């Protein structure tokens, strides 16, 4: 049996392919379309001319693909990654409010029919390889347009200096990134003799070969059949049989690591391996520095290169792994116990798939679930077919090619913040923007979670009735700050600006009920569910490339968002659970003050980094009456930000802040972080205009003639070490900051 081939074109579409600047084949970008079906976003390549004519490209399609949005009068820019999209030029903004309106004029063109906005959610460089390996081992033909554009994207993200790939698009090369992306390229048909592959292979060998990859790399390579399972540290499904009261049982772990461990443990127990074929036989020769048969894989379970070892395994975890290998597996892992563990693990996989209609929590666990379904249900089963369809929800097309998003989108998150930006900037009552905001409200209404999942306790899910998810209701996981921002956006439109009451008061109360259930005894809020275990579980962190992943931690951003939303709710509904809301806010504010550092900063876990957290923290303190003039905490937060302002008036923070846990200046000011810092200072009622005025001038100077801002450095982060893109941030945060400045200081002429 061989792996999944690249599918054939349905028509003569191969004739659409043309060489790109690197000599790689490229599809005809005028044939790509994004379909947004009630928040489910999938890309489609129209092979026939008839299809192409019936479904014209939208402005949003062209923007995402880096195409000009009207016929350019001048030759198109050669570097489409940073090129200006040729919407008509707008009158040059002279005031902050004009600049905000020009930005909104551009950004409004990108709203999709259901009312949401879309974007890539890229950055991590380990997602596509898991997908490609899944396609291969489940004999799933890869659509030819996917293969063509995935190849282009991976080569576009190869480091030109050393030929490798990193954990994310701005990271240094590592074994994880280099090995996995090399394998992905080989599986989609790239020759080992391609000069770029030779360079990548040379770097991998310099690192010591694939045996020096982290745990997740070794897992995927073993599934593919190019590494032996003896090289993978144990992932026993028996842990799922432990009573719930045990302090280290998996239900206590952070949701993402739990959902990855689930199918990983099932496949590890089954020792599923794709049968050897000519290509995987070749890969066995290419990935190592010595003959495959001479490698003692069992001796390399703990081998890892320093470039990958962000969070080294503890002595305790190494001891546990050794005991599992030497004692548990050979002497105590009896067949009856294994059968029970595999059956229960499979039941949990099945519930996750059914609760999300096979969309899954995220792009790491979902391909693993598909392999588990392939093994358990068979290649032609409904579960495998549905997974194949749902994996398309994670794919994204851009000018560089096709990537895999970090979730199945950012729909609710972006739409809520865009709504708030327009309100804060003062545009919500303008009849021009009312249809757009009404559509956004319709989208938020559609994606509020109206009921809990079946068997909630059995599958360890958090209460979700009344919540909003990060992406869409199909994925359907409660997220505390998404719930807070959805609640806040709804109240702003319905209560403050008389938009249609699409979401009833009872449903707003459901949202508040959900938020109150998510607070931890510490006063803080996690993102997906309350904290279920001790921080000591971090001693069992086996991922090596990520930190802070074993439990759901309190996050300043989630806590502050919840405080701000609850404060707004109580303004309009002061009698609903008033004492409980006050108590929750009091505890949360104490947490926010407690985690402020001596220098006045807060560490942000979902955006870069101290700038991001300061914006949320200072706004939440202001919502309870603590501002620059009245609160030492707010004052110190403002002074910290002011100490980081650059000469040009902007702020720029490197992603290294997230890794190193100290503020690291970016070499350039960044539009997004400048907006964050300004919003933080203005919400805290910082009284001096001069620093803010300088920042406004920078934001205005970076705006393009059509109203957009260009992509700069990466904006988001997760697990301390992996960065992720939020490209819509460069639109709505500056719009919000510019509009708020004009409201606070007057719409003065600055340019």
UniProtKB/Swiss-Prot annotation:
- Which segments does the entry list as coiled coil? none
Any single GO molecular-function term of the entry would be: lanosterol synthase activity
Membrane topology per the entry is:
Peripheral membrane protein
Active site positions: 481
Provide a GO CC annotation, any one.
Answer: endoplasmic reticulum membrane
Show the InterPro entries listed in the entry.
SQ_cyclase_C, SQ_cyclase_N, Squalene_cyclase, Terpene_synthase_CS, Terpenoid_cyclase/PrenylTrfase
Q: Does the keyword Transit peptide apply?
A: no
UniProt-annotated stretches for the region Disordered: 1-22
- Localized where? Lipid droplet; Endoplasmic reticulum membrane
Report the CDD domains cross-referenced here. Answer: SQCY_1 (cd02892)
Q: Which UniProt keywords apply?
A: Endoplasmic reticulum, Isomerase, Lipid biosynthesis, Lipid droplet, Lipid metabolism, Membrane, Repeat, Steroid biosynthesis, Steroid metabolism, Sterol biosynthesis, Sterol metabolism
Q: Report which reactions are catalysed by this protein.
A: (S)-2,3-epoxysqualene = lanosterol
Enzyme class of the recorded protein, top EC level: isomerase
Q: Does the keyword Lipid metabolism apply?
A: yes
Database matches in Pfam families: SQHop_cyclase_C (PF13243), SQHop_cyclase_N (PF13249)
The stretches annotated as PFTB repeats are 147-189, 508-553, 585-625, 634-675
Q: What is its EC number?
A: 5.4.99.7
What is known about what this protein does? Answer: Lanosterol synthase; part of the third module of ergosterol biosynthesis pathway that includes the late steps of the pathway. ERG7A and ERG7B catalyze the cyclization of (S)-2,3 oxidosqualene to lanosterol, a reaction that forms the sterol core. The third module or late pathway involves the ergosterol synthesis itself through consecutive reactions that mainly occur in the endoplasmic reticulum (ER) membrane. Firstly, the squalene synthase erg9 catalyzes the condensation of 2 farnesyl pyrophosphate moieties to form squalene, which is the precursor of all steroids.
**Record's family?**
Belongs to the terpene cyclase/mutase family.
**NCBIfam families this protein is in?**
squalene_cyclas
Q: What is this protein called?
A: Lanosterol synthase erg7A
């Amino acid at each position: 049996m061989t792996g999944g081939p690249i599918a054939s074109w349905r028509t003569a579409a191969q004739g659409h392919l043309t060489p790109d600047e690197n000599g790689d084949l490229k599809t005809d970008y005028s044939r790509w379309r994004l379909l947004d079906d009630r928040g489910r976003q999938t890309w489609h390549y129209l092979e026939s001319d008839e299809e192409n004519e019936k479904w014209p490209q939208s402005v949003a399609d062209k923007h995402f693909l880096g195409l000009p949005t009207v016929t350019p009068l001048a030759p198109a820019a050669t570097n489409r990654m940073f090129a200006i999209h040729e919407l008509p030029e707008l009158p040059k903004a002279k005031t902050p409010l004009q600049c905000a309106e020009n930005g909104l004029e551009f950004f409004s063109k990108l709203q999709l029919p259901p009312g949401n906005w879309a974007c890539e959610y890229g950055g991590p460089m380990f997602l596509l390889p898991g997908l490609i390996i899944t396609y291969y081992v489940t004999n799933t033909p890869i659509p030819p347009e996917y293969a063509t554009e995935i190849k282009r994207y991976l080569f576009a993200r190869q480091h030109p200096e050393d030929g490798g790939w990193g954990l994310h698009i701005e990271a240094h090369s590592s074994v994880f990134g280099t090995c996995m992306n090399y394998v992905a390229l080989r599986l989609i048909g790239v020759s080992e003799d391609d000069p770029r592959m030779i360079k990548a292979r040379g770097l991998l060998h310099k690192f010591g070969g694939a045996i020096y990859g982290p745990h997740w790399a070794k897992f995927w390579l073993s599934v593919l059949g190019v590494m032996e399972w003896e090289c993978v540290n144990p992932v026993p499904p028996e842990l799922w049989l432990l009573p719930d009261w045990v302090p280290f049982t998996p239900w206590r772990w952070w949701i993402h690591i739990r959902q990855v461990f689930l199918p990983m443990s099932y496949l590890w127990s089954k020792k599923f391996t794709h049968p050897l074929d000519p290509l995987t036989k070749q890969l066995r020769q290419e990935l190592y520095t010595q003959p495959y048969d001479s490698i003692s894989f069992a001796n390399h379970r703990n081998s890892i290169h320093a470039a990958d070892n962000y969070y080294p395994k503890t002595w305790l975890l190494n001891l546990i792994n050794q005991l599992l290998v030497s004692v548990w597996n050979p002497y105590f892992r009896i067949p009856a116990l294994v059968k029970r563990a595999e059956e229960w693990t499979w039941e949990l996989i099945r519930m996750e798939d059914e609760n999300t209609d096979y969309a899954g929590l995220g792009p790491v666990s979902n391909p693993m679930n598909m392999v588990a379904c392939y093994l358990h249900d068979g290649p032609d089963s409904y579960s495998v077919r549905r997974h194949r369809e749902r994996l398309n929800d994670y794919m994204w097309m851009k000018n560089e090619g096709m990537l895999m998003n970090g979730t199945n989108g950012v729909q609710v998150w972006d739409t809520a913040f865009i709504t708030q930006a327009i309100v804060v900037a003062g545009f919500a009552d303008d009849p021009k923007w009312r249809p757009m905001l009404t559509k956004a409200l319709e989208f938020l209404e559609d994606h509020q979670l109206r009921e809990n999942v079946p068997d909630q306790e059995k599958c360890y899910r958090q209460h979700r009735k009344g919540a909003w998810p990060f992406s869409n209701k199909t994925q359907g996981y409660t997220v505390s700050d998404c719930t807070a921002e959805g609640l806040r956006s709804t109240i702003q439109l319905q209560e403050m600006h008389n938009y249609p009451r699409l979401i009833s008061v009872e449903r707003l109360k459901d949202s508040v009920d959900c938020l109150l259930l998510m607070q931890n005894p510490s006063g803080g809020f996690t993102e997906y569910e309350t904290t279920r275990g001790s921080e000591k579980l971090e001693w069992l962190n086996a991922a090596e490339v990520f930190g802070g992943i074993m439990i759901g931690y309190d996050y300043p951003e989630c806590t502050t968002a919840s405080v701000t939303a609850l404060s707004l709710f109580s303004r309009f509904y002061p009698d609903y659970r008033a004492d409980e809301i006050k108590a929750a806010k009091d505890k949360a504010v104490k947490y926010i003050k407690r985690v402020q550092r001596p220098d006045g900063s807060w560490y942000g876990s979902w955006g870069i980094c101290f700038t991001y957290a300061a914006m949320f923290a200072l706004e939440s303190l202001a919502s309870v009456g603590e501002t620059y003039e009245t609160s030492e905490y707010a004052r110190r937060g403002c002074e910290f930000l002011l100490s980081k302002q650059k000469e040009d008036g902007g702020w720029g923070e490197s992603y290294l802040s997230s890794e190193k846990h100290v503020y690291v200046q970016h070499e350039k000011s960044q539009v997004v972080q400048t907006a964050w810092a300004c919003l933080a200072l203005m919400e805290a009622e910082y009284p001096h205009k001069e620093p803010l005025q300088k920042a406004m001038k920078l934001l205005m100077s970076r705006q393009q003639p059509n109203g957009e801002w260009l992509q700069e450095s990466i904006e988001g982060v997760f697990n301390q070490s992996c960065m992720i893109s939020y490209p819509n941030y460069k639109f709505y945060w500056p719009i919000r900051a510019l509009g708020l400045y004009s409201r606070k200081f007057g719409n003065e002429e600055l340019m």
